[in-house]
Amino acid sequence: MSNRARAVCVPALLSLGACAVMEPPPLPESDVPQRFIGPVFDEADVWPNTDWWNNFNDEELSAFIEEVKANNFDLAINRRNLASAQLTLREAGLARWPTPELTIGDATSYSRTSLDGATVSRGNENDATQLAATFTYSGILTKPAIYARDLTDYDSELAQSADVAMNTLATATSTFFQLLLIRDRIVAARQNLENAEVIGRIAQARVNAGVSVPIDALQQQIQIEQQRTALQSLIQSDLSARASLAVLVGRHVQGFDIAGQTLQNVEVPRVQPGLPSELLTRRPDLYQAETSLRGAAINVSVVRRTLFPQIKLTASASSSSFELANVLASPAQTTARISASVVQLLLDNGQRRRNIEQAKLFLESSLATYRRTVLTAFNDVEVTLSNIQLLEEQAEVAASSLMAAEEAFRIAEVRYAEGVADFETVLLAQNTLFSTRNAFLDNKLQRLNAILTFYQALGGGWAPGDIPEYWGVTAGGT
């Protein structure tokens, strides 16, 4: 190739490296609804805040979450993974530029001239200092696309870190609620045991008086033992829940406890979603799926550029002298060289074309995965909205049912003591009261967990690029 042709072709090929990478295919319009059809509260905030746990208005919960953020092992690993991803991105950023190399060394030379076996002249040994600098720039056409792919990998890692953090805090909150429910049920179990013992004493008195058969007292004794067993199981569950909370803050269960004793004081907050299209960038898992799609599209560009010639530029400069000071002070004695090579692979048995087809197939699979993730997310929001409304309605039913069950049991107890009602009537009223108490308590936990699930379904207040301060990682990676 002539110098003139090289002067024209090399800049043209270099310009190809700056070409825009392939854009990912868009979502079909039918995948993104115009609005959510589930019931919403008009007076509620749109989208959750990043400190959504404060909305439950429980100071101890808020303090516990702060301790989780500071001491949780999973969050600590999460921070290190993100810091490692930033280092990887910095390395990728440096790889875009020429690779420099600077060397310095000594060289020894000796001269001798012979003629017909006789030494004509003999030189002395000469020690010279050499200083050389080399800059190599290869992969010119593929590096921009490769770096764009590295950026999507970092964005994916950031979204995954946000998802892990949100799920960890949600797990901590849910476990906190579970412990409070267990303590509510312990109180209810003691009430149930007390109620059962009262009926047991009445049944035994009726047997002693000869107005009732012994089987009634025996059946009630079984009920009493069942309530004692249930109470012991709940006490064990309290320990198990405390152990789970202790692990979340990196502590041993010995000496760990929370002051809260009831779930009834925890408020059930309200929140509503915004436009469905906004959810695409608010949920970490959706954003991660989108970055995977972008990465697959960019990878097609990377593989396509293997069809182009491989360009390599090399620039070098060297200087030598018998004294180091002269090497540094005499640039006029420096030898410089610039070279460029263009290599085009002609035959590869179709391997590069097959690689392109594989990259395209992976892109299509990534689009399908993204669409599935998006549809699942939208459906999660709709289902959770409906579930929140259902649980709100059931809360009213559970409260009124509990009042009715308590009154029914009181009447049955009095009538049984007076001999008006039989044992089966009071046994039925007793069992109804026990189950109704548990249903009332369970409804509160279900409502809180439904809101917690809704916060997660809406992304927990996250936005692309957000790095919370408690992660201890500085934003940016280049």
What spans do the regions from the language model cover?
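Periplasmic alpha-helical coiled-coil/stalk elements that build and connect Gram-negative outer-membrane
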Residues: 159-275, 387, 391, 401, ...
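Small/polar, glycine/serine/threonine/aspartate-rich low-complexity segments that form flexible
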Residues: 40, 47-56, 66, 104-135, ...
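Short, charged, amphipathic alpha-helical segments
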Residues: 79, 151, 214-222, 423-431
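C-terminal structured "cap/appendage" subdomains that terminate the fold
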Residues: 412-447
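Sec/SRP-type N-terminal targeting helices
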Residues: 76-77, 93-94, 138-165, 215, ...
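Transmembrane beta-barrel architecture of outer-membrane proteins
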Residues: 61-63, 84, 128-130, 174, ...
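Terminal intrinsically disordered/low-complexity segments used for targeting and assembly
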Residues: 2-70, 235-281, 323-324, 457-478
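A short glycine-centered flexible hinge/capping loop motif at secondary-structure junctions
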Residues: 207-211, 416-420, 457-461
